[in-house]
A protein has these predicted regions:
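PRPP-associated nucleotide enzymes
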Residues: 1-135
Length: 135
């Protein structure tokens, strides 16, 4: 948490989006440390209020990710967090949700990046992406 805090403490983060489910662990702790709100990105049917969703391709099919419709506003600076970057498709879909909500700016963080993961094909090139460890 300390290392992530040092990276993002001066970025003006107002919301941290943790991606189901391992992104909740450090994402929630990081949101608390940054003094930001925490938003869960979850699979369909798990959030209690009205949601928006994005469907994305996986290696063997498709999947869908949702956030609450009112979780992010136009003045928010958002950090999207997940534990592992493999294909990047889940993160890319979550990033599109944050864009649709009108966030002012978004950053992306993974704890671990698998080398040769294809990040450039799935997450827009202009998005600042950080990882703590590459394998």
């Amino acid at each position: 948490i300390d290392e992530l805090y040092e990276i993002y403490k001066d970025k003006g983060i107002t919301k941290v989006v943790g991606i189901e489910s391992r992104g909740f662990i450090l994402g929630g702790a990081l949101a608390a440390r940054l003094g930001a709100g925490f938003v869960m990105a979850r699979k369909p049917g798990k959030l209690p209020a009205e949601t928006i969703e994005e469907t994305y391709d996986k290696e063997y099919g498709t999947d869908t990710i949702q956030i609450h419709k009112d979780a992010i506003g136009k003045d928010d600076v958002v950090l999207l967090h997940d534990d592992l970057l493999a294909t990047g498709e889940t993160m890319a879909a979550t990033y599109r949700l944050v864009e649709r909500c009108g966030a002012k700016q978004a950053f992306v963080n993974f704890v671990i990046e698998l080398k040769g993961s294809g990040r450039t094909q799935s997450i827009p090139a202009n998005v600042e992406v950080t990882t703590l460890l590459q394998l």
